[in-house]
């Protein structure tokens, strides 16, 4: 059996010298699961050596004590001193190391500054790359939300990815992430090893619900709650202890690891001792609070008898590993059934190697009939279906069983994640479109759960007559999910109920799989026409997770920042409708190209073919980050699959529609064909100005003064665009303002303002006509107008800012 599924009881702490890795939704130490149970430490007032840590004796006592409290991981906000490294090694503590840099101001505008930050990261990482106690690095922590909006989310994301790449180059065997927070929820570098989020929610129900959302943002990677705590100055020590107890219980069920903020009340930041917050498990005098001794609440989890059903047809290449993983499940009451659907290869000899497995054979009748036979033979009240090319996580059934704690949930499932590839082709296919994916109505309830990881109440399955026999290869899971929901049942997604699912190892097998999916869609259309659109594609109520990663597209208009960028939970909102490029691929365009060639319209044929390639490139751009690194040559092959996959799948679906007489029944309104968008109009940068001040002046004061002094109407931006104020004009030239205030040390602030000219289509056409009629005169008129608007805006802003004492204008 592969090492990545050979897991036993989660280790309290890794053995000395054993590095922590990631595998799917969890951390591992060797072949054992490892759950970081961490606490933050520092930053402190510099010691005698200038290090942001306590003196040697105090440091040793602190780390020894927190180890005695049961913590196995320490989060640091600065690189550790040599003394701290020695103590961590002695106590077998894992360290998550923060790498601080000048992130409080505009760090992107100057190339020299960017290179300096990258070099700083590489230097610090290189110093620690071989230390066995360093588990992971954070390349940043909670970048200020209005600063990210000012710099541009995509640009900041790209820079964080550069930092991770640079760090990984210096320490290829360490883990890297960025400590995010809800106010920039969308800001997730695509190359992180795990998702880290600082969350402060005081109500247990709110925290539990938000955890579910964070798992979808994490995708197929582990979720680490990198900060969570409660201020005793506000809520009291009793509430802190109670909160820590339920926090640990929730994380044990739904997160790969957690960090409590913080060990002590001591907190030194920006050269100042912070004394008005008291989050520590110990106070400044090291007096222990009740929360330090709090233990996780005991949660009574359901433990029904579960029948695991594996249906196979000639699956000799993967069945042995599948059964090996199933016999090692950490669950007290289950059985394993293998349903041999008339295989021509020797399934019996493989099953014979597992005495606890019941092998049941039928004449070849297809997947649905095999699933039904398994249900009839099963003794369990829960039927857990998986495929013969899957390998179950050791806690798979534990998570599935917990999902049936309420009668309304009739089916549960979790993620299916590609394991390390067996060859180069499987590495490409793992990143290709068309893999089995769950469809979510909200963060907890699913519309569809893939059949490779699907548990159903036996009573609910029998009530709808089981699986339909005509789904012989694929589509059975979609049909069963829709029918369960039509009967009022609800489907639950459980992020921890993970299976490894091998993707196809040859391109031919992948394309045959997609052809099978297309044929199954025709069958589904016959049975459920209301779920299919005019061109034959399935129409879901929920969002599909798989082919398009929900946090990858940071295009303006998809993020809701809130008025003036102050939204507390700033997330990405996707409509689920089609963009115009989605119409340019598939069978229809191949037919149009063929017709154009036959008619001799070669230019049109070339144009149509080029547009279909453009659609493939766009599809490739929107795919999730490849689970395994791809070379440029492999990316070219992936683009080719993005082009050919819709053709193969749609062609098979169309063929099935014709033979079955299937017709779609969903009638969309015209607005549903295209994605609704909050994209900004064309904008031209008029200029940028900066004002330095003390703590008495910021962007809100500037915007308020400008609003009061501006002679015309002023509109507040709606929160979808990276704007604060909009100054409309009757002639089609609208000016907009974007602001940010940078908070530097010793109370120094820098408020920046950017003026943008918004151009309507009419003004663009008018400018084009003027330039065409007379290039020189038109250019002079346009440049004069821009200069006038820039100067006028600058004068108004300067007057508003300099009207306050202590404000000075900075020269660029």
Task: Kindly label every feature range from the protein language model.
Residues 383:
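Short aromatic/hydrophobic "clamp" motif used to bind/position activated sugar donors
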Residues 149, 154-253, 280:
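Extracellular glycoside hydrolase catalytic/binding regions
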Residues 414-415, 429-447, 462:
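Short, flexible, basic/aromatic active-site loop/helix in glycosyltransferases
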Residues 325, 340-348, 390:
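A conserved acidic beta->alpha catalytic loop
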Residues 395-426, 490, 502:
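Conserved donor NDP-sugar-binding/catalytic core segment of glycosyltransferases
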Residues 324-333:
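Short, acidic, metal-binding catalytic loop of nucleotide-sugar glycosyltransferases
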Residues 261-305:
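Aromatic-rich peripheral "rim/lid" segments of glycoside hydrolase catalytic domains that contact
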